[in-house]
Amino acid sequence: HHLKIACFTPEQCVYPISVSHPDKRYRDRTVDFFQRHIEAAVCLDCSCMVVSTGFAYLDVDGEDAFKWAADSFSQICRKAESEGVTLALEPFTKYTTHICNEASQLLRLLRTVGSPALKGLGDTDVIATTGVDTFETFIGILGRENLAHVHFVDGNPGGHLVPGDGNLNLDQALHTLEAFDYKGYLGLEILDRRYVMNPEDAMRRALAWYSERIG
C-alpha cells in the first residue's frame, strides 16, 4: 500500500523504561533500549522516533531526576545523530512524572542536552490534562524549530479520543499549527477502550474529521 512510518514509537509505558530512574543500571538499560530502537527506526526507513523521560519517583528530588534524564538523553542523542534520526521527546502528564510535563520543562531539557537530534512533541491530550499550558502557549514556548511531531487527539480533557468525541478545541489547535507554519505530521494516538472492538470505525471517523478540515 506504499505506506511510510511517519514517527516510530517504541513501547515505553508498559515496559520498565525510564531515564529518570534513581538506579543507574535501570537508566543504562533504558539508554540501550532507545539506542537499539534507533537502529530499528533506520531499518524501517523512519527518521523520527518518540522518546520520553518515563515514570518518575515522586519521592526523588526533581533536580536529581532531571540530571539523570539529561545525561541519559545525551548518550541516546549521540546514537541518533550518527544515524540521522530525530528524537521527539514527549512530555507525560502530571500524574506520571514531575520531570517533564509542561513546555518550560521540556524546553529546559532540550537546551540542557543541547543536541540537534532532540526535539519536542506536542500532545493535545497531555497538554490539556496537565493544565499548565494551552496548546497555543505550549507551542509558543517550545518554538516551531523545536517541534518535531504532534499527537493530535480529543479528550475530556484526557482520554486520547477520536477528534470530535471529546471537548477539546481541536479546530483552534489546527489554527495554531497553521499560524506557526508547522509542516510535520499529526499522529492519531487513539487509546480509549471504547474503540477496541471496532477500531476501523474509529479510524474512519477520524479520517472524516481531518478530511473536512485539511482536505
Where are these regions (language model features)?
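A generic structural signal for well-ordered alpha-helical segments
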Residues: 1-2, 41, 80, 177
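Short acidic, glycine/proline-enriched helix-loop-strand junctions
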Residues: 1-4, 85
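Short active-site-adjacent helix-start/loop capping segments
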Residues: 6-7, 14-18, 196
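Hydrophobic residues within beta-strands of alpha/beta enzymes
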Residues: 6-8, 49-50, 87, 150, ...
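Active-site-proximal loop/turn and secondary-structure-junction residues that shape catalytic pockets
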Residues: 11-14, 53-57, 91-95, 124-128, ...
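Active-site acidic/histidine proton-transfer and metal-coordination neighborhood
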Residues: 17-119, 129
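Histidine-acidic metal/acid-base catalytic patches
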Residues: 45-47, 100-122, 127-215
